[in-house]
């Protein structure tokens, strides 16, 4: 097997085994024969792109092309997401849930659909990324602003400030160093206007 696909096929096998799925079950889900899957996993057959996509999707995975410069952030997100299920506090889960429910009711209050989508996407990421105590304080403050405005909907300017705070939290959590010896990446997930 070519070195280029070896790590991908190893990840697919690990995903299948983690889901306690047999090759036969994977065969039924993917449409590939069990012997084809076995050959791919053993490295005796170089899988075609279509086969890789079929197997990945049968395992509830996606194969995507991403810009190389974003790989540190993507790896950080994937590492955080896989490790965060036991790490997130119930307070963080509650805050994200409250903001998601609030957002569902007040989506139209944002200045643009793009700003609303970014806010929603930021919340989705924050559901999986553990926050520090300081970041939780900022998150609590943003949520408290919304609580104070229950009687009167917040102005677009206030929504923009809250959205900026949530984006900042998301970026901080995504770019947080896992090891102090590793320098932080010099990029953001989206453009932010700090003068807003």
Swiss-Prot record:
GO CC list: cytosol
Keyword Transcription: yes
GO molecular function, one term: DNA-binding transcription factor activity
Record InterPro entries: Bact_TransReg_Diox (IPR050807), Cro/C1-type_HTH (IPR001387), Lambda_DNA-bd_dom_sf (IPR010982)
Ranges of the DNA-binding region feature: 23-42
Keyword field contains Lipid biosynthesis: no
A Pfam family this chain is assigned to: HTH_3
Annotated spans, Disordered: 174-196
Keywords: DNA-binding, Plasmid, Transcription, Transcription regulation
Positions of the HTH cro/C1-type domain: 12-66
Alphabetized SUPFAM superfamilies for the sequence: lambda repressor-like DNA-binding domains
Domain of life per record: Bacteria
Protein name: Uncharacterized HTH-type transcriptional regulator y4dL
